[in-house]
Amino acid sequence: MIKTLVIGSKGFIGSHLFKSLSAQGEFEVWGSDVVYDYTSHNYFVIDASNSDFEEIFEGNQFEFCINCSGSASVPDSLIHPLRDFYLNTVNVFKLLEAIRKYSPKCKFLNISSAAVYGNPVVMLITENAALRPLSPYGQHKLQAENICMEFHMFHQLKTCSVRIFSAYGRDLKKQVFWDIAQKSIKSKKMTLFGTGEESRDFIHVDDIVYGIECILKKGEYDGAVYNLANSIEVTIADAAAELLNSLGWQGKLTFTGQLRKGDPLKWRADITRLKALGYEQKISISEGLKDYVKWLKEEKLV
């Protein structure tokens, strides 16, 4: 059994990854997060604002540690930059320092973000594109990537970072699709930020998990970075229309014409490196949004 630790195992990506790895049979999966879990023996409770990972690694030898923890809000990072820095950067350093001391053979996979790119000059966005974050969140994710490289270069730890683009899917109660769904309940008139022509490279959480597993098993751990997306550019207007159609909403959608601070204009990833590891998209944006609406209705959230 491959002993694997998922940090942030109760979060959006972490919880789906934990379930998938646990179901495969070859992994002995342990979790760690800020909430208590009285039903699981393979679980560590941590205080994210004052984390101490040394006790975890002092008593356990893991083959893999996957860091899915941290804050994932651009607006919140602008309001509370120190908190965001601690959750997204300092905790990565503390994790790697604990691994360096007690479990130096452990491979560390860090979940990063496409926010490190900001507004790219060239589309497609390769992993070698210029890194110009537009927010503290993006800057802190980039600093965490640099820390992963630091521990590889100077302490010979095996690390890599995964830059996830626009994630969505069941259990996500924030960001654009959640906001649209909640607004659809309240009114037949809806206003969204931007012009609608802004674009994203959306990826369903099931495909995110599949991509992480491809990197986990076949990726390089020399401080490498991987884009995790589908290399399909979808405008916000088209994505919103698809979701509202699945919701059965009939009303008037308008856009403010103004971007929120920290939001990029257009994203489309080059996923050549990821596809070389065997990744192929399984869930289209249309299928994924229908599944998201099904979940919203099952949970009586719309």
Model-derived regions, located:
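NAD(P)H-binding glycine-rich loop region in Rossmannoid oxidoreductase-like domains
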Residues: 50-87
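Glycine/proline-rich active-site loop of Rossmann-fold NAD(P)-dependent oxidoreductases
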Residues: 142, 157-158, 167-179, 188-189, ...
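Amphipathic terminal alpha-helices
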Residues: 285-302
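Conserved Rossmann-fold NAD(P)-dependent oxidoreductase catalytic core, especially the SDR/UDP-sugar
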Residues: 65, 93-134
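Conserved catalytic-site region of short-chain dehydrogenase/reductase
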Residues: 74, 110-124, 136-142, 167-174
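C-terminal "lid/loop" region of Rossmann-like NAD(P)-dependent oxidoreductases
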Residues: 195, 223-226, 234-241, 248-266, ...
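Conserved beta-loop-beta element that borders a ligand/cofactor-binding pocket
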Residues: 113, 145-170
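N-terminal Rossmann NAD(P)H-binding glycine-rich loop of SDR-like oxidoreductase domains
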Residues: 4-24
